[in-house]
Amino acid sequence: MKENIKPKQLDMLHGSIWNKLPLFAFPVAATAILEQLFNASDVAIVGNFTGAGKTIAVAAVGANSFIIALLVNLFVGIALGANVVIANAIGRKDQETVRKAVHTSIVVAVLAGFFISVIGEILADPVLTLVHVPEDVFSEALLYLRIYLLGMPVILLYNFEAAIFRSTGDTKTPLVVLTVAGVLNVLLNLFFVAVLHMTVNGVAIATVVSNAVSSILLLRRLIKTEEWTHVELKELRIDRIIFEQIIKIGLPAGIQSAVFALANVVIQSAINSLGTVVMAASSAAFNIEVFAYDVLNSFSQACTTFVGQNYGAGQIRRCRKVLILCIVEDTLATACAVVLILVFGKQLLSIFNNDPQVVSLGYTRILMVFSAYTFSMLYENMSGYMRGFGISLMPAVLTTLGICGVRVLWIVCVFPRYRTFTGILTAYPVSLCVTAILIFIALFHYKPSKKVQINNI
């Protein structure tokens, strides 16, 4: 295997940082946006090709958005643990740890995917009942969720594989692979729904097939590479020590991401109580606003990976520079994305559903959510910075308090008095503001950059 960094990989340990952060972050953002397009194309196509039942079909897909996010985010966070372990080992030039972490990650992804599929199929019905999916939407929502859950092994495998590539600085390969899968997803959606006249079952099948293709392509690339991340099928096993390191960092990060989604499930339950039109509006808006969030979050991932490698190499001052530059560049990039969406928001909403009431309510949601993005950007980057040092539990705990705690309290205590869509959405800026303050206080007092460098996280 080659010890030197490939030309397509970023050298995070030497040279200027400011110009390398966008080179890492933008492909990550583009990849995340394509992943969102899997679900967005589902919503858009069922909203335009299912005739009189389009509102029910859109609401059925939307009712699952936060449930799916809860599951996927948990294991994407654990995959981030693999990212940090591998990045730290690369910084230390520890090839053996890189090899063990790569093989452990792949096995964990597949086994966890099968576990979620089995448990998810058992709990799908009661979970949809728990979040108060309306009776007229329930059967379609359940059908979509059951099919989607069958694809969890390949969905998780792709996300762990992408984390492996990103830990080396290669963010372009996951983007290229997902571009191919994304185009396939849209074509399959059109074929199943417009040609075969299927409904949510067609778009769910298309999403699973597309994710299978992306995971297989990335696995093939890992098998063929001669770099440290080379995969040897006969070596696929879980290394206990590496697994513990991944879980130590990744599980709190996964809980942090899952808590975000869990809080949104609570909010979705309140939204469901306002009827099908509000559900459809919220679903359409979510599939648009999340594109700006993907830009925002990409710099947080860059912060984690850059800090992880530099921490492994003992370059602590460089770690601090990474945080400052991530906040500055993230602010500029996210602001551009937000402005574009605000300008074209109503036109974008009409792609999903051209009902005037749905468009109006959807745009209201976009405005309310974007009002909180300054707080979101700050807490995401500060959390990413701490994770790069292997500090993952504290951000997870504070996020649970700030996001999940505040939003649940809001829905329980405030929403019953102000039973409106705006009354629900106000929970977003309030909870994100509280979380940003908590993370800042923790960062100021904990001072992770003052930690003494250790051999392993």
Name these PLM-found stretches.
Residues 43, 55-58, 95, 124, ...:
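Membrane-helix interface/capping residues of multi-pass secondary transporters
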